[in-house]
Amino acid sequence: MSESVANRAVVFYNNKSLPIISSEELNLDSCYSSSEVVIRVHAAALNPVDFLLQSFAYSWLVGRGPKTFSRDYSGEVVRAGANVKDFKVGDKVSGLFQHLYGKQGTLCDYLILDPVKQPAISKLAAAGHAEYDDYVVNAAWPLVFGTAYQGLTNFGQKLGPDSKILVIGASTSVSNAFVQIAKNHLKVGTVVGICSKKSFDYNKKLGYDYLAAYDDGSVVDSVKDIIGKNLNNEKFDLIFDSVGNSDFFGCINDVLKDKGQNSQFVSLTGDKKMNYSSPRIWDSLPGLESLKRYGPFRKYNYNLFMLRSDSAFMKLGYEMISEKQYMPAIDSVYSFDDYAKAFERVKSNRSKGKVVIKIH
C-alpha cells in the first residue's frame, strides 16, 4: 500500500501577491525517479535573494503558477531511487537546492532532488551548538559558506600566509563564513574587515586581524591607516565586498595590488547596497565605473559573481563544522507557521546571522 502525505510549502504567485501556505498530497512511493531522493525537510534558512526575486516576479515575466522560497535545507532521506549511489534512506543531510522561480523550494515538508543535478548536498555535520540542534545549524550554512568559498577560490588566486584581504561588510553571514575559511582553512596571514564600531569585539573573535569602522570618520582613511601602520604599506591581494560599496574605486591603486599580480576585487551585489524590503532593479545595474573594469578600459581585476552549485564547498563545510573550525551565525529560529515573522526579520536588515525556519 502506497504512502501519501501532505506536502506544505510557502508560495507566492507574483510580486503583488502575499506569500501563503499551500498544501498538496504527495505519494512518497511514486513521486521520485530512480536517480532521485526524497528528503523530509527539518529546517530551511532564508536568504535576501528570496525577496529580491519575489520583488522582480512580474506575472508577464515569470508566469502565473506558484513559486517557492529558500534554497538551504537540512533533513532526512525518506526515499532513495535505485540508481542513487551516495545516499540512502535514513541518512541525515543538508545542502543547497538551486532554483529560479521553481515550483520546488526548501521551505516545504518534502524536497525531491537528483544529487547529481543538485550536487551541493552532504551528510549532516555534528555541530555541537550550545543552543541549536544540528538540523538548525546545518540549514544555516550552505549558501553563505559556498559563496564565501567560491569568492576565495574561483579566480585563480593562491591565498595563504603572505596574503592580505580586505572584507567590506565584515558582519554579514557570507563574510562570517569567509573569514573563518580564510583563517582556519587557507591560513591567510592578514584579513581586515569593515563593520560598525559596535561590532568590533564580535568580529575580532571570528579572526579578523584589523577592523575599520564605517560609522566613525572616513572608512577609506581608516583602511589606508591600517595599510600604512600595520601592513608595512603592502596593499591587498583581494578585496571582497559582500554588501555593495563604491568607496574605494576612486583610490583603488592605493589599496589593491596591481592587476598584473592577479589581485582581485570580488563583489556579490555590485556598487550599491540593496534594500531588500523594497529593491529597485536599477540599483543592481552597472554604472560608469564599470567601464574601468572591462576591455581596454580595465584598470583592475573585477568580478561580480553568483554562487554555483558544487559538492566541493559542501565537503569542506562538513569537515570544518565537524572539526570545530567553522560555525555559522544564527540570528533567530521561527516555526513554519510563523514564516511571515521570519520574512520580516530578514527584510529588516537588522538580523545578525541567518534566519532559520524549523519545519519538523
Curated annotation (Swiss-Prot):
Gene3D superfamilies: Medium-chain alcohol dehydrogenases, catalytic domain, NAD(P)-binding Rossmann-like Domain
Record keyword Mitochondrion present: yes
Gene Ontology CC: lipid droplet; mitochondrion
Sorted UniProt keywords: Lipid droplet, Mitochondrion
Primary residence: other
Subcellular location(s) of the protein: Lipid droplet; Mitochondrion
Domain of life: Eukaryota
Intrachain S-S bonds: none
One example GO MF annotation: oxidoreductase activity
Keyword Mitochondrion found: yes
Family listed: Belongs to the YIM1 family.
Protein name (record): Protein YIM1-1
Organism of provenance: Lachancea thermotolerans (strain ATCC 56472 / CBS 6340 / NRRL Y-8284)
Gene: YIM1-1
